[in-house]
Structure formats: structure tokens, C-alpha cells
């Protein structure tokens, strides 16, 4: 019996000893430091860069409270941006280092679970580039805790939503249109392509209201309405195909983002970033060589609507759905090597639509096709 009592006592003392050790070490061994935003499924969020800049409130927290202050370096990881773009179909660039504060730390006081680090970024000219802040936790300089490797990075995308002047156009004469110089052939040979723009039509009263006619050795003709009404649908005729049609559900006086994508076998129509139609079409005979572009091109007999347009982009490859969705509300970098042409259509006056790529593929609005310019047009995300 004495042996049993002695064994029991020794076991109890051992348990007490180990429990005491666990309590002493718990805050260090069972704890971690991480970014609250990185704890969710999304690894990025969008913040708006205004004239006054932007304040980003970054929550840095512990899994468990500590009995001592915890201090951690805060910094940036631009080397992670390329992999992020690859995974998400984005074209972001890391914000220049001189736009960010350097050598900063954040402290979670003893007994607290978190702290807010406020990062202020002054407004700056983005020139068509969408920048991202690759926020990152650095070394823990005070406190017995380690940072979470999986949740120590987060991407804050700096958005400057489009706010532009747009031309409202309607053909005055039978052959009046907007077009690039027919005497300057582009000679852009492509295997796949994407044409995208913001478009608003005042009516769908007649057929064959052609918003685009690509000048090439193979047909690419984009219009609202064919022979059979009602005509509130988009049709794309490509490479001798009879046409790819959307549903008849387009509304007058509503802005739509339209993207036409040929991926080498299928012609796909996207509206507001979502696929709404698509089918197999013949391959371009002799390959596709694009030499020019026309807009609002079917003449006054057919084109009776007032058509507003903005941000016309022609690419030499098939853009993914993610790429379309992630870039349609913002400017794109005019230096992107995959652009055949980029026409923001935001001059606010005149008859020349400049090609922002610098390739010189400007377009001219003939005669009186521009009825007016509308200022301060924005394209915000639809909830």
C-alpha cells in the first residue's frame, strides 16, 4: 500500500511539474504572429488611391495574448508580385520603393491581441499601371514568438478607377465612320486575339449596328442585330463563320464591357467580364493579319443609335476571363508588348483618337460623327 501511495504522489508531482512548464512556455510555443487580412481565403484587397492618397490600416495580430510587448519589422516583398500575377491573371507592378516608408516597426503591447499599423501612401501618377503594395512582416525584434510563414504577406492593390471623357457618336452620312489610316497597314500577324471596350448604345431599333470592323485578311465584324429582330443582341462574324450570337437581353443606355476573344479554335464573347456566348469557328485562312480598325462603321442607314465608347484595347493573344475581369475597370499599361493598339478615347475634344501604345495607330472620327463629349464618366464595379 505504501508503494502505491508513493507512486501516486510521485506521478502527481510529475504532472504538476510538467503542467507548470507548459504554462510557462505556452505563450511562446503555442503562439504565432500574422496579418489579419492574410488569414482569409483572399490574398489581396483593393484600395482606392485618391487625390489625397490612401491610408491602409493593416491589422497585425497574435494567436494568443503575450505577457510582454511584441515588436516586428514591417516591410515589402516585391519579389512575390510576379508569382501573384501568374496565379491571378493580373498585370500589377510593385509600387516603387520611394513611395513607401522604410525602416518601420509595429508593436503589440503586452496583454493585447493585435495592433493597427497605418500605412499612408501619397497620390502619384500611375500612367496606366496598376500598382500593388506587397506588404510583409519582417523579423520579430522583441518578444518570444515567431511569425506565421503562411500569413505574413498580403497584397494591397492601388486602384485608380477610370474617370474619363467619352465620345458619343452617330454616323451623319452613309459611309461616315471612325477608322485608322487605311494607307498605313499594321501587318500585325496573330494566332489568337482579343478586342475589348466599354460600349453604350441608346437604342437597338435596327439591325447591323456595327461597333467594330477589323481590317484584316479574314473577317472580324462585330455588330448589334442581324436580320431577325428584336435586335438587342451582339453578333460576331469571324473568319467566314455565319456568326456567334448572344441572347437578346441588352438594354439601351447601359454601359457594358465587351470582350471578343479568339483562342485558336473558339470565338468567345464576354460581357462585364463573364462569358455569355461562344462556339468553334474556322481557323483564319492563311493566318490572321490585322491591318487596321474601324468603329461605328455601318453608316447612318443602319447605325441609328448614339454610341458612347471608351478604352478600346486590341491584344495579340487570347485574354483569360480573369485578365478581363481584373483589368476592365482600370487603365492598362500602354507599354504592354502584347497590345496591338490602345485607344482610351478620352481626348475630350477633337477628332483624333490617339493610340496610347506609341505605335502611331491613331484613328480619325470622320466629319460630324462625334455628336458630343461626356465628361467625368466612371466605370465602377457592379455589386
PLM regions: where:
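Bacterial Sec-dependent N-terminal signal peptides
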Residues: 1-5, 11-52, 149-160, 383
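Contiguous beta-strand segments of beta-sheet-rich domains
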Residues: 68-81, 115-141
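Extracellular/lumenal carbohydrate-interaction signature centered on repeated Trp-anchored short motifs
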Residues: 51, 181-195, 247-254, 302-308, ...
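Extracellular glycan-recognition modules
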Residues: 162-233, 319-323
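Flexible glycan-contacting loops in extracellular carbohydrate-active proteins
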Residues: 279-308, 334-338
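Extracellular glycan-interaction surfaces
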Residues: 159-170, 200-204, 223-282, 372-383
Amino acid at each position: 500500500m505504501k508503494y502505491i501511495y508513493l507512486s501516486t504522489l510521485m506521478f502527481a508531482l510529475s504532472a504538476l511539474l510538467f503542467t507548470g512548464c507548459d504554462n510557462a512556455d505556452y505563450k511562446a510555443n503555442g503562439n504565432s504572429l500574422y496579418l489579419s487580412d492574410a488569414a482569409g481565403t483572399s490574398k489581396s484587397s483593393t484600395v482606392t488611391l485618391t487625390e489625397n492618397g490612401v491610408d491602409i490600416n493593416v491589422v497585425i495580430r497574435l494567436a494568443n495574448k503575450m505577457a510582454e510587448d511584441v515588436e516586428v519589422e514591417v516591410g515589402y516583398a516585391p519579389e512575390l508580385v510576379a508569382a501573384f500575377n501568374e496565379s491571378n491573371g493580373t498585370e500589377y507592378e510593385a509600387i516603387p520603393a520611394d513611395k513607401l516608408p522604410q525602416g518601420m516597426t509595429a508593436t503589440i503591447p503586452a496583454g493585447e491581441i493585435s495592433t493597427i499599423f497605418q500605412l499612408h501612401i501619397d497620390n502619384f501618377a500611375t500612367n496606366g499601371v496598376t500598382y500593388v503594395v506587397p506588404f510583409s512582416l519582417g523579423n520579430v525584434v522583441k518578444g518570444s514568438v515567431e511569425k506565421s510563414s503562411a500569413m505574413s504577406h498580403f497584397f494591397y492593390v492601388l486602384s485608380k478607377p477610370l474617370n474619363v471623357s467619352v465620345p458619343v457618336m452617330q454616323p451623319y452620312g452613309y459611309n461616315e465612320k471612325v477608322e485608322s489610316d487605311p494607307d498605313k497597314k499594321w501587318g500585325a500577324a496573330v494566332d489568337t486575339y482579343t478586342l475589348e471596350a466599354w460600349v453604350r448604345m441608346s437604342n437597338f431599333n435596327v439591325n447591323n449596328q456595327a461597333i467594330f470592323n477589323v481590317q484584316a485578311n479574314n473577317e472580324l465584324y462585330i455588330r448589334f442585330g442581324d436580320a431577325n429582330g428584336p435586335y438587342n443582341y451582339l453578333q460576331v462574324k469571324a473568319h467566314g463563320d455565319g456568326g456567334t450570337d448572344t441572347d437578346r437581353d441588352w438594354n439601351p443606355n447601359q454601359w457594358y464591357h465587351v470582350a471578343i476573344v479568339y483562342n485558336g479554335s473558339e470565338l468567345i464573347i464576354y460581357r462585364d467580364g463573364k462569358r455569355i456566348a461562344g462556339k468553334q469557328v474556322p481557323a483564319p485562312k492563311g493566318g490572321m493579319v490585322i491591318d487596321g480598325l474601324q468603329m461605328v462603321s455601318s453608316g447612318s442607314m443602319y447605325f441609328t443609335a448614339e454610341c458612347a465608347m471608351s478604352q478600346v484595347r486590341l491584344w495579340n493573344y487570347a485574354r483569360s476571363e480573369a485578365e478581363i475581369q481584373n483589368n476592365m475597370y482600370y487603365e492598362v499599361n500602354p507599354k504592354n508588348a502584347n497590345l496591338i493598339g490602345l485607344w482610351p478615347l478620352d481626348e475630350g475634344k477633337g477628332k483624333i483618337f490617339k493610340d496610347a501604345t506609341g505605335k502611331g495607330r491613331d484613328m480619325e472620327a470622320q466629319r460630324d460623327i462625334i455628336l458630343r463629349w461626356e465628361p467625368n464618366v466612371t466605370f465602377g464595379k457592379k455589386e
